[in-house]
Amino acid sequence: MLQCAPKKNERLRGSCDFCTQSKLRCNKNKPSCRRCTIQQQPCVYSVARRTGRPPKHPRKANDCQEANGQHGEQDPVTSTPGGSCQQQSNHLLDVEGDGANFTLADASTTAQGRETAASSALDNALLVGETFGFSSLLDDPLIQSDDFLSFSLCMPPGEEEGHMASPRALNGSTGPCSPTVLSSIDVPHLPARFGFLESSVESGLHGRTGPHLVEQPDKIVPSSFSEMEKIYDEGLTFSGLDSAINAVTNNGKGEPSASGTMAAHPHSKRQCFCSTSMSKLQMLISHPTLCQKNSRARFDMTLFLEEVVFNIHRDVLQCLVCQSKSLHSLASLCICTDWVIEALRDVAQDLSSGQDNLGGFRAGLCPPKDKFSICVGRFVLDDQLRESCTRSLVKYRLRKLVPIMDTMMKLNYRGAGGALSQAIRTMVEDVRHKIESALGMMEL
């Protein structure tokens, strides 16, 4: 980048989205900052996303648009489409669960905050590799290659597609991918008999990126991997719950159906579906197929239900209608959370007893006979490292449920008291005890 003269640009006043340094004007009339110039790195300053007050007069707005036109030949890294000088304002509150605590963050955060969050997420993804037992592989000279960070679930040639992996893992299996795929191991996926929910494998693996929803008057059906990924990324668990209930009830036969109204606007100001989603979750958990005696739920189905519990709890916290939390809703959510804890504790018990190196599970991340293997670069993890990965995954899921129970206890104190409030308090304490017991079992 060319050296910039220390002349302050009055029109492009603001700060860099990356390093929050003041702006300078260089001899090419491109906005940049001092730190990016010194370190010879592309400056991520964007006029459209700059912070500050909007122009008070239309003439100033026109001047701003002219300035954007003058800088139309900027570097692609620093330029953004459009030339708007508008501010993005969104007063909704997002609830972020980082596995240790819940924090309320204003959704109108600047691009600087998003860049910082993305950077920290990348660092966390690299640190996750150590907890999953990958640190022992880092010293191997053969692993120092460009595709080392290609973390995916690989299937030997000639095998049938009997078990569907997560969309991110499948997309990563076709070639090198970003380091953030290291954290995709905790993305839940449905069991093999729910494979019809993710039918369009080829369309998801051959360059199809745009969403394509099959819209009908009464339902919205996902038709590709990208749409399934979008549904779960946006927290639209209603469609997934309806599909899972239909699959469990009909043994995977028939087409899944979901109410388009509930799947489209889970946080609508006029309608609230938090209690509806919890009722659907409780209906699925209490179904005889998942509650048979002397049988345990599939590992991937447990991960799917745990993710649904986490998303529903987040929806309840950020819902604009649920100003006063219902004790009946808390009781339903606590019952569902208790079921997930029991299922994860069964997995922890099998891991502690060393039962057949995960072969005792009916299915999951590592089915028998190495039909799917966890790969890091050119290496396939052996049984010991696969067990370490699953153990770390179960620990992460258990610890992620701890702040949910803490928040339940705080919301319960807001109630009027009585027998139901006391019952919820007892259930929360019992679930916390089960979490601590399972974590202690895995530490032994």
Swiss-Prot record:
Q: Where is the composition biased (Basic residues)?
A: 50-59
A GO molecular function assigned to this protein is:
DNA binding
Under the heading Pfam families, the entry gives: Zn_clus
Query: Which keywords fit this entry according to its UniProt record?
Result: DNA-binding, Metal-binding, Nucleus, Transcription, Transcription regulation
> Could you tell me which SMART domains the record lists for this protein?
GAL4 (SM00066)
Span of the signal peptide? none
Inactivation phenotype: Abolishes the production of AF-toxins and their precuror 9,10-epoxy-8-hydroxy-9-methyl-decatrienoic acid; and impairs the pathogenicity.
Question: What Gene3D superfamilies would the database entry show?
Answer: Zn(2)-C6 fungal-type DNA-binding domain
InterPro entries attached here? OAF3, Zn2-C6_fun-type_DNA-bd_sf, Zn2Cys6_DnaBD
Where it sits in the cell: the answer is: Nucleus
Q: Which residues bind DNA?
A: 16-43
Q: What cellular component GO annotations does this protein have?
A: nucleus
Note down the stretches annotated as region Disordered: 49-87
Give residue spans, biased composition: Polar residues.
76-87
Q: What PANTHER family does its record include?
A: MONODICTYPHENONE CLUSTER TRANSCRIPTION FACTOR-RELATED, OLEATE-ACTIVATED TRANSCRIPTION FACTOR 1-RELATED
Q: What else is known?
A: Gene clusters encoding host-selective toxins (HSTs) are localized on conditionally dispensable chromosomes (CDCs), also called supernumerary chromosomes, where they are present in multiple copies. The CDCs are not essential for saprophytic growth but controls host-selective pathogenicity.
Q: Please describe what this protein does.
A: Transcription factor that regulates the expression of the gene clusters that mediate the biosynthesis of the host-selective toxins (HSTs) AK-toxins responsible for Japanese pear black spot disease by the Japanese pear pathotype. AK-toxins are esters of 9,10-epoxy 8-hydroxy 9-methyldecatrienoic acid (EDA). On cellular level, AK-toxins affect plasma membrane of susceptible cells and cause a sudden increase in loss of K(+) after a few minutes of toxin treatment.
Task: Name the chain's protein.
Answer: Transcription activator AKTR-1
Q: Which organism is it from?
A: Alternaria alternata
Source organism lineage? Eukaryota, Fungi, Dikarya, Ascomycota, Pezizomycotina
